[in-house]
Amino acid sequence: MLIMSSIKIAIFASGSGTNAENIIKYFGDKSLCEVSLVLCNKKDAYVTERARQLNIPSVIFTKSQLEDSTYVDELLSEKGVEYIILAGFLLKIPERLLNKYHKRIINIHPALLPKYGGKGMHGMHVHEAIIAAGEKESGITVHVIDADYDKGETIFQAKCTIENGDTPDTLASKIHELEQRFFPEAIKNYILKTR
């Protein structure tokens, strides 16, 4: 009987880590995937505390350690990482990692790409732009990343309605609900399809 080991994934995050925590818990039984590492570029980001509470190793690194050295690459190799999940990660992934993990780096964007994507379009900036434009719907896009911001292949989208009176804050809450509900499952389905 062939026993397959779980697929190792790493989460890159820059903030509080609610999506990271949700992903870690979703794959907690380790039957398909195992979050083996959380990587963060901000020393005061709460995501590292969430990882600690869930017994997942976390490492803080600098922008230059990501861009100009093999430090991050070595951490990923040591853990046998096969897929990288970007969960609120605000730095651009260098080309060498894009090549090494070709079509195996997944991001979530808080809008329905191709609208409201690109450099500088993250978090509240996105929600403010959507409300200012008078859009009637928004949502999330889970996508594979490539060398251009928010241009990679779309894996999954989910929508929400924007009501009269919605603000960037109320829209952010709706988007967060979609992220919590759908992001882990979209990751699972993509990995099942591509592994």
Region annotations inferred by a language model:
Residues 1-195:
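One-carbon transfer enzymes
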